[in-house]
From Swiss-Prot:
GO terms for biological process: isopentenyl diphosphate biosynthetic process, methylerythritol 4-phosphate pathway; terpenoid biosynthetic process. Binds 1 divalent metal cation per subunit. The keyword Transmembrane does not apply. Its EC number is 4.6.1.12. The record marks 34, 133 as: Transition state stabilizer. Its cofactor is a divalent metal cation. GO terms for molecular function: 2-C-methyl-D-erythritol 2,4-cyclodiphosphate synthase activity; metal ion binding. This is 2-C-methyl-D-erythritol 2,4-cyclodiphosphate synthase. 4-CDP-2-C-methyl-D-erythritol 2-phosphate binds at residues 8-10, 34-35, 56-58, 61-65, 132-135, 139, 142. Pathway: Isoprenoid biosynthesis; isopentenyl diphosphate biosynthesis via DXP pathway; isopentenyl diphosphate from 1-deoxy-D-xylulose 5-phosphate: step 4/6. InterPro entries: MECDP_synthase, MECDP_synthase_CS, MECDP_synthase_sf.
Length: 157
């Protein structure tokens, strides 16, 4: 059994779609980034890569690489799953939390879990996504950005 942890944060800006867990969420701001800036998927990818001792997303998907400009992070997650499979790993369990003051994410959690489970080719009950606020404290509480943490376990075979 291997354990990984991931973290990511992106700035909220106008004129960008907000994408979390592969779900487009109606909101006046979106996350700034080279790809679609899906902070949840980025944290998950870092956890998965770390558990397999494969480095981090910056190593595999550098933000100065033109082919990743605007790419769906779900596509990158699929590539991470393939990298894990090459090393003989599969996802046993994934738990993640999105830290955002707004918007409310509860209505979208199930769709996020379904997208992630489908992409990782695991049962839905192997993926848990939560959302929390910071009670108006820090950058997330001021609405300047959104962060995400993820923990995973991998198994061989």
């Amino acid at each position: 059994m291997r354990v990984g942890i991931g973290y990511d944060v992106h700035k909220l800006v106008a004129e960008r779609q907000l994408v979390l867990g592969g779900v487009v969420i109606p909101y006046e701001f979106g996350l700034l980034g080279h790809s679609d800036a899906d902070v949840l998927i980025h944290a998950i990818m870092d956890a998965l890569l770390g558990a397999a001792a494969l480095g981090d997303i910056g190593r595999h998907f550098p933000d100065n690489e033109p082919r990743y400009k605007g790419i769906s992070s779900m596509k990158l997650l699929e590539e991470v799953r393939e990298k894990l499979a090459v090393k003989g790993y599969s996802v046993n369990n994934l738990d993640a939390v999105v830290v955002a003051q707004a918007p409310k994410l509860a209505p979208y959690i199930q769709a996020m879990q379904q997208n992630i489970a489908r992409t990782l080719q695991v049962d839905l009950d192997s993926v848990n996504i939560k959302a929390t606020t910071t009670e108006h404290l820090g950058f997330a509480g001021r609405g300047e950005g959104i962060g995400a943490y993820a923990v995973c376990t991998l198994q061989q075979g």
